[in-house]
Regions:
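Fold-independent oxyanion-binding glycine-rich loops
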Residues: 18, 48, 188-189
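Short aromatic-glycine motifs in intrinsically disordered, low-complexity regions
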Residues: 58-64
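C-terminal all-alpha effector/ligand-binding and dimerization domain
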Residues: 71-224
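Short, cationic-aromatic polyanion-contact patches
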Residues: 41-58
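A generic structural motif
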Residues: 39, 49, 78-81
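A general secondary-structure junction signal
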Residues: 39, 47, 165-167
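Long, compositionally biased intrinsically disordered regions
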Residues: 67-68
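N-terminal helix-turn-helix
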Residues: 1-45
């Protein structure tokens, strides 16, 4: 009882350190993309998905001809050593990394409702270390080709697309919440810069989605 009655000693610095510690922690959370500071609002939890700026390879339109927004959610990022079309194209072993994303299109229910599709983005991590070091959450909504142009001066100059029908693997089925073996539209994307191969992508798109628009005959792909 006597010990409980004794006053607790608090030094002058102890009243300041927690504040500094909290501020540093908040700064770290902002840097990690976990929280966002907005003027007039305060600090809020960052959205788990973000809208993709100016999609190029897969665009969908509503009934009025407006481009539907695409939201991206990065699911994983890892080194890729297995064989595939990216291997011969990029020639980047053992530095090939793949970022796996789920892409969400939001539509009114009367137009079919929301739908998802799946993406693998392959690149040479030795050339583009920023995609390896930033948090996965920070990559949500990022236009990778624009980031490559802005930070590394590598502008997209040519794109080749290959389309086929492909059965959903267990991984793809889990990401899209569909049955394994479901027939999907597979889109393989080979992207080039002035210096050669830039990146390779795989898209898996449910067959019931609306018409896909792929426009690669643009005057300035760097603006995309």
């Amino acid at each position: 009882r006597e010990s409980v009655k004794q006053p607790v000693r608090i030094s002058r610095c102890s009243t300041r350190r927690p504040c500094g510690t909290v501020q540093r922690a908040l700064k770290n959370l902002v840097s990690a993309g976990l929280i966002v500071r907005k003027a007039g609002v305060g600090t809020i939890v960052a959205p788990w998905r973000r809208e993709l700026e100016n999609p190029l390879h897969t665009r969908f339109f509503d009934k009025h001809g407006n481009v539907l927004p695409v939201y991206t959610e990065v699911l994983s990022r890892r080194r890729e050593s297995s064989p595939g079309p990216w291997q011969d194209f990029l020639q980047s072993d053992p530095n090939t990394l793949v970022i796996k994303r789920r892409l969400i299109i939001e539509r009114p229910k009367e137009e079919g409702g929301d739908f998802c599709y799946y993406n693998h983005f392959y690149f040479d991590a030795s050339k583009f270390p920023v995609f390896k070091t930033v948090s996965k959450r920070e990559l949500n909504g990022v236009n990778f080709k624009r980031r490559m142009a802005e930070e590394f001066g590598l502008v997209l100059t040519r794109v080749t697309n290959h389309m086929s029908i492909y059965p959903a693997t267990t991984e793809i089925a889990a990401a899209l919440n569909i049955d394994a073996g479901t027939p999907l539209i597979r889109q393989r994307v080979y992207a080039y810069s002035m210096e050669g191969p830039l990146y390779y992508q795989d898209y898996w798109i449910p067959p019931e989605v609306p018409e896909i628009v792929i426009d690669t005959a643009l005057e300035n792909l760097a603006d995309i």
